[in-house]
Amino acid sequence: MKRTYQPSKIKRKRTHGFRARMSTVGGCKVLARRRAKGRLQITV
């Protein structure tokens, strides 16, 4: 059986990267929450 996680740097950046987060309202909210919490790394 194939494992579910097949790492790809491109897919990772495109779905969870900073620009991907900034492109949607929900993504902007995610970043805002992470900044408010004080996360050192807000995106991948």
Swiss-Prot record:
Keywords: Ribonucleoprotein, Ribosomal protein. One of its GO terms (cellular component) is ribosome. InterPro entries: Ribosomal_bL34, Ribosomal_bL34_CS. GO terms for biological process: translation. Belongs to the bacterial ribosomal protein bL34 family. PANTHER family: LARGE RIBOSOMAL SUBUNIT PROTEIN BL34M, MITOCHONDRIAL RIBOSOMAL PROTEIN 34 FAMILY MEMBER. This is Large ribosomal subunit protein bL34. It comes from Aster yellows witches'-broom phytoplasma (strain AYWB). The lineage of its organism: Bacteria, Bacillati, Mycoplasmatota, Mollicutes, Acholeplasmatales. The gene is rpmH.
